Amino acid sequence: MNEFQLKYGCNPNQKPSRIFMADGSELPVEILNGRPGYINFLDAFNGYQLVKELKEATGLPAATSFKHVSPAGAAVGLPLTDVLKKIYWVDESIGELSPLACAYARARGADRMSSFGDFISLSDVCDVATAKLIQHEVSDGIIAPGYEDEALEILKSKKKGNYNIIKIDHSYKPEPIERKQVYGVTFEQGRNEFVINEELLGNVVTENKEISQQAKIDLIIALITLKYTQSNSVCYAKGGQAIGIGAGQQSRIHCTRLAGSKADNWFLRQNPKVLNLPFKENIGRADRDNAIDLYIGEDYMDVLADGEWERVFTEKPEVFTKEEKRAWLDKNTDVALGSDAFFPFGDNIERAYKSGVKYIAQPGGSIRDDNVIETCNKRNIAMCFTGMRLFHH
């Protein structure tokens, strides 16, 4: 098929709506189940580019969790620790996790509040282990280059048989020129085919020039994630995954703060106080995620007040104090950070440092680069200038 009719566009009043190939050729996708919508396809095509590039850059299977045309999480298939399995709600009954399943668990688990109702993109054929993980999550749909037979049947059972499943031709290569219309005016530009790899990290401008191999992988993950995140954007990454993404902010410091708060939450969820919260057996994942988000945040009394805690816990948990949280966050180290444009002030570095950042990749080019470098030197952070902006709109 060279076009697919959609129910509507971004909003129900925006009709007619379709996706199509302007040159009359066949669409590079098959709809295996459901009826994906306009925003679903935006998430699918942006997300698939991200995971395809992650796989090419690292050689590892990759997954991303998209919401409203920005990733909530992105990761490659490195093994999970027992703690990560617990905070990502990985059920032991699934058995051994494939690398692709690990990538999906990481991508979905980094920011579970934002990933609720996500659209999933996978770099590889969806296997049974990955499908079993997805089966238990609230999700709008998935795109992948293929599906094992049993995995496809598992996914088809979601949403009362209406789960959106898209298969994309992995050999598809888009035209080098892309176009879109705004207010009746056509915009045209070359596709962003800039390749992000280790060579991009060679210009280390700080006194500390030591960037570990794992940190290089994490910086690559952060930068590729930013390439498909609405600007301005900042991404914190650690251990093969994004752990905090700040998207669509109009000031750089707000990107850094937003992404940093998400990275902090990811690490706070690993504290024994949170791991051992006494949830009632009948409390579902979404309610647990909401309760944890409140418990580790400033509004903890919203879940600990008398009359509230009884709804989700078997007994009232102790307060996770500000001092305890700060002491725990101080243990988080070796975090990598990418920025889609230069840092204009050193305050971004100071905020990043509070969330355990030790490695930074950013374009450079600010008139205050000296101040930013000086702040990195003060905090013993290794920073490289890539010379390449990664805006995405």
For every predicted segment, state its role.
Residues 118, 122-123, 136-166, 171-173, ...:
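C-terminal binding/interaction regions
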Residues 23-35, 110-116, 190-209, 287-308, ...:
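Gly-rich Lys/Arg/Thr-decorated short loops/hinges at beta-loop-alpha junctions or inter-strand turns
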Residues 72-112, 243-342:
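Glycine- and Gly-Pro-enriched alpha-helical subdomains that act as flexible
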Residues 61-62, 67-72, 78, 233, ...:
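Glycine-rich phosphate/pyrophosphate-binding loops
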Residues 1-200, 215-233:
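Active-site loops and adjacent core secondary-structure elements that bind or stabilize anionic groups
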Residues 57-65, 165-168, 231-238, 268-279, ...:
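Flexible, glycine/charged-enriched surface loops at secondary-structure junctions
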Residues 70, 126, 238-241, 249, ...:
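Active-site-proximal loop/turn and secondary-structure-junction residues that shape catalytic pockets
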Residues 53, 228, 265-269, 354, ...:
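Conserved helix-loop functional segments at active or binding sites
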